[in-house]
Structure formats: structure tokens, C-alpha cells
Amino acid sequence: LRRQRQMCIRDRIAAVQNGKLKEADLDERVGELVDAVMELTSGKKLSDKNFDRNAHHQLARKAAAESMILLKNEKQILPLDTKKSIAVIGDFAFSPRYQGAGSSMVNPTKVEDMSSILQQYDLNILGMTRGYQRNGDVDENDRKFALNLAMNADIVIFCFGLDEISESEGLDRTHMRIPQDQIDLLQDISKVNENIIGILSAGSAIEMPWHTCCKAILHGYLNGQAGASATLDILTGKVNPSGRLAETYPISYEQTPAFRYYPSNEKTSEYRESVYVGYRYYDTSKVRVQYPFGFGLSYTEFTYSDLIIEEDGIKVSVTNTCLLYTSPSPRDAH
């Protein structure tokens, strides 16, 4: 984010220097902004800072845990077996992507990261490392250490996703992939350890050709200041995941209806799908997707039957098909 701000400032300075932007016009725009700030804050009492910060943090933790989406859980690798050794790999475990960039940013009272709170959970942590760099640089020594750590662990928790440069306001994404260095490391880890739990952080839909590398995928989106403890609450079985996707995840960018018309060569953007936006397009065109709108697993399994669709709603019978999930049961180490 700091890099984006610096680039924006440099662009404005360069525009003034080369004559593309008049300094008087820039002064006028800044003046309008200052006037708006003064008008909105004049005579208003500042918000009370004497609030229960811990209670607010716990509320953020609860909201994050109830929002996270379990996309995959092969062979019930989750919740974690506390007896198995675990390697935690990924820059996002140390520097979480907990909120959006630009004007959506707010000041948290505190921010958790997974690496700092793991000791609060009854887990057998073999080791932790970044493995990849947030800015795309490659540290070969750390990468080798990550692969060696993964090779010697029973389970790998891999924290990855879109960084702040990949998605923000004021710019359009040029593709739907996560950074390639993260994918490369994930694929290499999968060659030495098949028990990978992917912890995904991203603010929008992405391509997931690498999903076969993971036995489980837990998607946190941008899960706030208490996202790390919320994630571990789900991984350890303290919370049963219940979140659902609010958008469709296509298999590839080429499946999206705007693919042929983006980026636009004109001054306007074309939305030729009309009312068939989002899930409406995929449902209508019968396109097979990676994960559909509304998808989400839990540690409990259900069946649906007797579906009745009426003008004012839907009726359906839901049957629990396994033992009601309350907490992870003890397992023998293998």
C-alpha cells in the first residue's frame, strides 16, 4: 500500500512537471477535499475511545470464524489431529492480509498473526517459515528450508493468496491468478508432502488450478484483525465452519462472460451479460465451475430432500447424516 501511495504521488508530481496537469487545478482539487473534511468534522464530537477493546476483538473473532468458508476437506484431514506434527509455511502466517487497501482501510486496535498465537493452541508445531516473499523476491535458502520442513512434517498449513498489490481500488486486475511464486512453492511442497491444508486470503474470485495440491482449503477472504485466532479455532475444531461463498469461482478466467470484452479498447466498459451477472450467468449457461455461489462445507454432513419452490420462498427437509459435530475426537497417531 505504501508503494502504491508513493507511485500515485510521483505520478502527480511528474504530471505537473511535464505540463499534463496544471498546478492550479491540483490545488483546487486539494482545496475541495480539505473543505469537505472540515465540513464533515466541524462541531462534531469525536468518537468515544473508552470502549471495551477486548470485547470488540472477540466479536471480530466470532464474525470471522462464522464467515470463513471450508471449500475442501478430503479424508477429513480437518479438524487437525493434535498429535501430528505440523509445519506452518507462508508469508501470510506472519503478515496477514486482514483488510482491503486504499480508502477501505481502518485502524485496528490490534492485529493477530498465526505465527504469534500458535502457542495458545494444543498443536504439535514442528516449525514455521515464510517460504516465499510477499513482494515476489526469491530467498532460495528460505525456500529450501520450507521444503525440508514440509518433508519432515505430518501436515503442512500453507498460508497464501492475493497480496495488497494484486488487488486494490484504483486499478483492475489483469488476471485471476495468485502470484506465481506462491503456486510454485505449493506445487513443490505437494511433491514431498500430500497432507497440505491451504489457508487462502483474497478479496475476490481467483483461478484455482492448484487446488489438487491441497487436501483441505479454508478460505478466509480478508478476515479482519482477529482472523488468525478465528482460523485456528476452525482448524482445531473449536468452531464448525459455516460460511458460504458470496460469488461464483470459475475454473478459468476464460469462463467469465466479460472475457472477450475486457480490457476495453474504447473509453467505456461493456457489460454484455445484461442481467445475467454473477451466478445467474453460470446457472443459465450451465457452465461447470470450480465452486458455485453459496458453496461451503462444514464438519457435519447433511442431505437435502423434499424441495418445494414457492413464490415467497423455498421449503426443504435437512437431515443430518453423521454424528453431530461438537469437537474433534481423539485419534491415534500414525
Q: Where are each of the predicted segments found?
A:
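Secreted, periplasmic, or luminal enzymes acting at the cell surface/secretory milieu
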Residues: 6, 10-102, 106-115, 119-121, ...
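Hydrophobic helix-and-loop "lid/oligomerization" segment in the mid-to-C-terminal part
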Residues: 51-52, 125-212
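Residues within alpha-helical segments
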Residues: 61, 65-68, 147, 151, ...
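Residues immediately flanking
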Residues: 91, 162, 330
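Acidic active-site catalytic centers that drive phospho-/nucleotidyl reactions
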Residues: 154, 320, 332
